[in-house]
């Protein structure tokens, strides 16, 4: 299911033994464009530290009740490796964090989730997963910080990042919502991270290998409507790009 980040912000987080807080923001990596951590606002509990929840612990998003189910207890979260509010998420912290929970490390292979292109819940496969694959160095970004970044087409600016649309099964970022208000009023469009050429973090700018006119003529995105596969097919046909679901299908040939 596809969900907007801004919609998920404020959702209650329901652990195995009660509510632990609400969704504050997310961290994603800029290689696979996949959510790596949900950042929880725990109120007066666990103050002074970032409470990070990996998608391995996210069981389901219940939109009707505006909450996310987590398969962790409060004690597990409280005893987890601590990261101060003003500290970045380092590789050393991630290794300690993943070791604590016993999850396979997502940077341990070529796919979105290491040895696999999706989150594997079978613990028997986790030990093998951690022994396979070439590791890579993740660079994590905050969805809150990237909001507002300018979008640079091949022939000029077209707007800015307004939000992200994620797939709550794989926790991949499927689209960036681009607000083109400063260029042509009243229209928002979707752009896949796969179409991004590069990102200048120092300039807060995202470079896309598409022209402004091509983007302008793309199927309009309405925040009031659900994103259907028919709409996605139309969008990808317009840009003459293969859908992410094609690659996802190819990636299902996995190590046994």
Which ranges hold each PLM region?
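Peripheral interaction segments used for macromolecular assembly
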Residues: 1-256
